[in-house]
């Protein structure tokens, strides 16, 4: 998966300061919740279930262009600290502030999270797109996160994720993955072009 170079860059601000800027705390596990460019109603369920639980964490919701969803998440009180963002090109900055990712098993979001050493919590069921189901299996096989049948299971899944030994293991496994395609592919293409140019025979006019 080719990712934007910004997902490999060093943080632009220190984590404690970044969290404080969002009104969040440095002493709580932080999840970034992202469901593509238009968000998902599942984000409301995740917010409600975790808020009603006894888990101690905080949430960064990225709702994309779904302003109605963003407004719904901003309205009303919440037991858990949260920050709600709409559309942004700074997903990498929010991921730098997080400890893990919650979302769908799309190749883009999962690859971005893992590039930043974030373990993932994703769902996989009959409604999951066929091309995304393998990603969920891959997450389990590589032990880089938790796969749910539905987000009704989010509370125990988060409990498992934030258990210190599990989080450390998942993060170590995520950090061991190397996806440098954005930097490697241009060089590979250049080599292919060079070989192609060398293999082309000089043009010879066709005799009539």
Explain the meaning of each model-derived region.
Residues 92, 110-116, 137:
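Short alpha-helical segment that forms part of, or immediately flanks, the ligand-binding pocket
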């Amino acid at each position: 998966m080719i990712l934007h170079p910004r997902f490999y860059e060093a943080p632009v601000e220190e984590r404690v300061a970044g969290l404080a800027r969002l009104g969040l705390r440095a002493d709580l596990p932080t999840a970034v919740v992202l469901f593509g460019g238009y968000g998902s109603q599942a984000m409301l369920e995740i917010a409600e279930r975790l808020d009603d639980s006894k888990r101690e964490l905080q949430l960064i919701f990225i709702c994309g262009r779904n302003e109605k969803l963003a407004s719904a998440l901003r309205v009303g009180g919440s037991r858990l600290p949260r920050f709600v963002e709409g559309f942004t090109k700074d997903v990498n900055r929010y991921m730098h502030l997080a400890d893990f990712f919650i979302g769908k098993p799309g190749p883009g979001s999962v690859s971005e999270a893992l590039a930043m050493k974030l373990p993932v919590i994703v769902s996989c069921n009959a409604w999951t797109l066929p091309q995304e189901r393998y990603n969920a299996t891959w997450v389990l096989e590589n032990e880089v996160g938790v796969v749910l049948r539905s987000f009704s299971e989010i509370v125990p899944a988060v409990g498992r994720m934030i258990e210190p030994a599990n989080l450390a293991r998942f993060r170590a496994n995520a950090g061991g993955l190397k996806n440098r395609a954005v930097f490697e592919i241009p060089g590979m293409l250049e080599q292919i072009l060079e070989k192609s140019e060398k293999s082309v025979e000089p043009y010879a006019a066709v005799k009539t």
